[in-house]
Amino acid sequence: MKSKPDDRRDNVDRIQQSIDNTIENIHETNEMIENTNREKNKDDLKAKNCRREAALDEFKSEIKDEARAKEKGYK
């Protein structure tokens, strides 16, 4: 059985979509934080957004790497 060749042509687009979705989730969660009175819920939501912020940093680093690889022809 042959393995599929590594097709990275759409990686930058997929990562950008993940960035966009994560930013949207952060905004939605911030709205939930503003609209809840329960401190436990607020703390949980804030922690979730902290993890999302960390993921955004990773996505941004990854998208730079992929863009450089794309310029070099993925070699």
UniProtKB/Swiss-Prot annotation:
InterPro entries: SASP_thioredoxin-like. It holds the Pfam family Tlp. NCBIfam families: SASP_tlp. Belongs to the Tlp family. This is Protein Tlp homolog. The lineage of its organism: Bacteria, Bacillati, Bacillota, Clostridia, Eubacteriales. The gene is tlp.
